[in-house]
């Protein structure tokens, strides 16, 4: 559905916000009025203009793309995560919630405010509100739910600052959790999901708006606030709050809701929405709640790292060579220097120029700090070619000057310090050592020994040293051990014994997802496609704007601008939630069991996740990351504490003062990490990256000067360099240098050359089918008890016990028993002689 349908006002829903003008140069660089420009008198008019243009281009290139001060974490700041729950269209509902609470509160308490009551009075009133949720009248129930939402929002009408609202919010939410609000809300949510009248009404409606999902939105808002607030740990938390947090996390991940974890109920809402049976579901809130539920029950990335270290010690594996989270946090965005071959190539292209003015040291500094990935805007289209256009448009010192001045002595700064070594310890797989020994034996001795990695008889001394070095850096992953154990279980099902499956939250969640996991993945990717900024509005695509569009479309340009910002923000939040959910599930399933991860990953690949993510990045990614789709004065809790100023076009366009949008950069990094997870060690999927021409798309993403994002882009480029041809590698030496500098080295990995054994013809179907067979065997062995191999089931040989077993016959069979007896027994002749023989 077109967002602008039904309203006369033009709706602005693009991501291209007006950019602020570039900052003026420093005051010291400005000549007084009438004074000649530096160097202008030394060059002819045309050359002077070109020199100044090159200077300006260099300085602008540096000022436009500074290093982004972004710290990757599980979530954004608490206040930001709260504000993203509400769309700006929901603004008037804050006062409705307050009104519903105060009307009910004044009946029972006449002379005091909520903030003036003691804990017992708070608990009494909270339980009274909870009882009100059990009334049958929908309108009364909605009023009580709004009153509870107001309490969860921090009773902001009695607070004077945002900090006070947040403080009361934490207190109120732990109070609501203590009296059992969450379980009552789950029952109500279940009832709303099964509300066939609301579903059929929404299906018949031509245009769905905010009003169609009021009940669901109120319930989901309260539940999200509870999950998000309880999950956030604060230093001043009471001891009982910490205990409640642990209990809540355990309950949320346990199969207590319809014999399934709570996340499965939310996944069911996603699939029901995508199937078209419930188009009124507020999908942004469902996805945000799903993300925070998965995060709360399974744990974040730092918790995952500690779980990984613990699991390695249980399996008897050596500890991890480094903490990847800390290494990435200490990395800086890549600005590799131009190599000699690049400079020579540029000189050959441009030819020797005439004598030029001497270059100041500050220009050299600007050159040193230039972003090597920044290409001219006019060359955006040329990046589809194999040339490294990041080099074009840069004016190198050796070209501009024949007489270089002696460098000035600058004090040592952080940017001039060079790293002492590569950030990552190299790794070697057992398979790599086997391949190296196989090739060495066939070369020097003329025979092979299979998977024997210890016998080195007859091999020269340098080969011995090489093997020693390889074994020093040998890394055995948890996934390899799990795959070997699975092979053992399948090879010897009787002697292997019964597998002990620890019921951790990830295992419980996987068991709940298993029956419908393909549908869940397809539904999430459908919504991701609809929310991507590159997707065009189609009549057959799903409408994800049901919980942002008002009942009456805007009539003024200002209202249209506000709604346009709201719609773009809404889509960005959806992308953020889906990318985070997928990444968390992939990482936790991989730790729990590699075949759980492979099952989910394969269904993502089958649902076209790889081209979808590449399509997402096939846009101006810098514009997406710096988009200002937010109106800070309308963000919660600012909007409920301060008086709202009159909105103008300028205030709408201004956005916030940050140099980037946290949620968009977070989403981009998550999607790159998902792409890495799907393609790592998968030859056929790596070839998909090559076939879909991902290299120029990924190279454009390197313009974002953020170390973590660059690292995952470089990883994706590294795995496909051997297939891109010699000319691409030759033309992209800066990118190759950055890969060498930033990405972990695998000894014996000829990633920079095309002569690797893996650079072979690929058969996508054969590789995926072999993997699928392993996954199906794993799922059948561990989860499909009904279809176990009958040869391995215990046999009851006792006649007494077999005859004594109670068989439950269906009721209709019992009623027509005589008919069955006549047709199946008496009417068929029995050859007793044959039977007795």
From Swiss-Prot:
**Residues bearing PTM N-acetylmethionine:** 1
Give residue spans, biased composition: Pro residues: 18-35
Q: What UniProt keywords apply to this chain's record, in alphabetical order?
A: Acetylation, Cytoplasm, Phosphoprotein
Please state where this protein is localized.
Cytoplasm
Chain residue ranges for the region called Required for STRIPAK core complex formation: 796-837
Which superkingdom is the protein from?
A: Eukaryota
Q: Which InterPro entries match?
A: Far11/STRP, Far11/STRP_C, Far11/STRP_N
Keyword Phosphoprotein part of the UniProt annotation: yes
- Basic and acidic residues composition bias: residue spans: 47-60, 356-377
Q: Where is the composition biased (Acidic residues)?
A: 378-391
UniProt modified residues of type Phosphoserine: 59, 335, 339, 788
Q: Where is this region: Disordered?
A: 1-66, 333-423
Q: Name one GO molecular function term.
A: protein-macromolecule adaptor activity
Annotated GO CC locations: cytosol; FAR/SIN/STRIPAK complex
A single GO BP term for this record reads:
cortical actin cytoskeleton organization
Q: Which family does it belong to?
A: Belongs to the STRIP family.
Q: What does this protein do?
A: Plays a role in the regulation of cell morphology and cytoskeletal organization. Required in the cortical actin filament dynamics and cell shape. Part of the striatin-interacting phosphatase and kinase (STRIPAK) complexes. STRIPAK complexes have critical roles in protein (de)phosphorylation and are regulators of multiple signaling pathways including Hippo, MAPK, nuclear receptor and cytoskeleton remodeling. Different types of STRIPAK complexes are involved in a variety of biological processes such as cell growth, differentiation, apoptosis, metabolism and immune regulation.
Q: How does it assemble?
A: Part of the core of STRIPAK complexes composed of PP2A catalytic and scaffolding subunits, the striatins (PP2A regulatory subunits), the striatin-associated proteins MOB4, STRIP1 and STRIP2, PDCD10 and members of the STE20 kinases, such as STK24 and STK26. The STRIPAK complex can be extended by adapter proteins such as SLMAP:SIKE1, CTTNBP2 or CTTNBP2NL. Interacts with CDC42BPB. Interacts with CTTNBP2NL.
> Can you say what this protein is called?
Striatin-interacting protein 1
Task: Tell me which species this is from.
Answer: Macaca fascicularis
The encoding gene = STRIP1
